[in-house]
């Protein structure tokens, strides 16, 4: 796939990189702005992050931005952080929560009806550029291995051999009146596994996967399975009764018994998990739950800096030159060819209104993300 170096290019005006494309959101379905297959772009972006290649990461993220594929972009960001960074620098979870809130603020200041126009917003470009730089620089850990559930594991007669909890009190802390009673023994085991007493990371992951498999079997039999509504889940109300929130209820309640920073980390992970949540997306985001378990079960050193101090200057330099990426992408736009007639003209009334509404100032020249 095509990629080149951008940050040696000097860009003087935002107009040089302003995207004026005739295509609507529907025309980008399955493709990036430059007509690469979206699946391939996501793969290239993830590989760029894995191999710490900042410039390609900025390019491929911009391809998704210019096509309005923000959900896909955030999914790649969450996947990379939760699977490849996790305890290497878990503080990045708090940082990402901050940036998601910044992203929502920008959208709510005039872009709710047309997310494609976000591609020309300078703060959006710098926001994702900064995220790419920080993820590329992040300290890594070995990726989590998926825990497999065997068919025999669903046998209710033999599964009891895996039970370790000494009492039923662990599950009683989280189970509510309308929660499915048949799940209680397994919820109790999961809750015990993440306590300081039980402290069994492998079994905690096992019980999560067991609950997932049980839910899948119920759906296959067309049996509805829901829990009592958990209002702490900031998702669509129809999704607040998904079984997954029992698991997060366990994590949140256990974190309340730990230090303030662990509580803050857990709340941040919960917030990341809820981003554009739909029933079934927990499979894509289960590494966030694996990370939550690791935080509760492992001794780890919490990094206070989101990025190495020596790299902070480089990040700011790249942010200031990010428009050079969009200059390259602009070459692939589909337009009338008459944009030169409007070069230098003032923005539309809507754009001017957005600028007045936009009071956020999170991207200073010398900004260094730090807890």
Describe the predicted segments one by one.
Residues 25-26, 56-59, 66-371:
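C-terminal alpha-helical interaction modules of replication/initiation AAA+ assemblies
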Residues 3-4, 8:
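Cysteine-centered motifs
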Residues 36-40:
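Generic helix N-cap/helix-start motif at coil->alpha-helix transitions
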Residues 28, 42:
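Active-site-adjacent structural elements in folded domains
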Residues 13-27:
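Short, charge-rich, low-complexity alpha-helical interaction segments
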Residues 44-47, 53, 61-63:
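Conserved helicase/translocase motor-coupling segment
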């Amino acid at each position: 796939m095509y990629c080149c170096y951008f940050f040696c290019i000097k860009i003087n005006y935002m107009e040089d990189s302003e995207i004026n494309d005739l295509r609507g959101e529907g025309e980008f379905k399955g493709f990036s702005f430059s007509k690469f297959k979206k699946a391939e772009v996501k793969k290239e972006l993830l590989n760029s992050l894995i191999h710490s290649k900042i410039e390609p990461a900025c390019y491929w993220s911009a391809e998704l931005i210019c096509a309005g594929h923000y959900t896909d972009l955030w999914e790649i960001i969450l996947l990379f952080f939760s699977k490849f960074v996790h305890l290497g620098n878990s503080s990045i979870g708090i940082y990402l929560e901050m940036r998601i809130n910044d992203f929502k603020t920008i959208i709510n200041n005039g872009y709710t009806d047309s997310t494609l126009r976000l591609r020309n917003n300078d703060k959006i470009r710098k926001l994702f550029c900064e995220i790419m730089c920080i993820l590329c620089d992040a300290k890594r850990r070995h990726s989590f291995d998926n825990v497999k559930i065997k068919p025999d594991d669903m046998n209710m007669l033999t599964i009891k051999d895996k039970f370790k909890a000494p009492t039923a009190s662990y599950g009683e802390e989280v189970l509510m009146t309308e929660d499915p009673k048949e799940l209680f023994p397994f919820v109790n085991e999961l809750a015990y596994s993440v306590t300081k007493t039980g402290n069994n990371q492998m079994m905690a992951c096992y019980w999560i996967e067991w609950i997932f498999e049980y839910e899948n079997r119920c759906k296959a039999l067309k049996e509805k399975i829901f829990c009592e509504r958990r209002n702490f889940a900031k998702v669509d109300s129809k999704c607040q009764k998904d079984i997954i929130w029992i698991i997060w209820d366990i994590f949140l309640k256990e974190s309340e018994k730990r230090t303030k920073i662990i509580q803050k980390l857990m709340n941040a992970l919960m917030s990341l998990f809820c981003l554009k949540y739909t029933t079934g997306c927990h499979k894509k985001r289960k590494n966030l739950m694996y990370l939550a378990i690791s935080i509760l079960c492992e001794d780890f050193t919490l990094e206070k800096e989101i990025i190495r101090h020596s790299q902070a200057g480089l990040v700011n330099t790249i942010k200031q030159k990010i428009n050079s990426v969009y200059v390259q992408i602009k070459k692939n736009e589909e337009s009338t060819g008459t944009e030169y007639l409007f070069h230098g003209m003032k923005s539309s009334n809507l754009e001017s209104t957005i600028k007045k509404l936009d009071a956020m100032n999170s991207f200073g020249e010398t900004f260094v993300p730090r807890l």
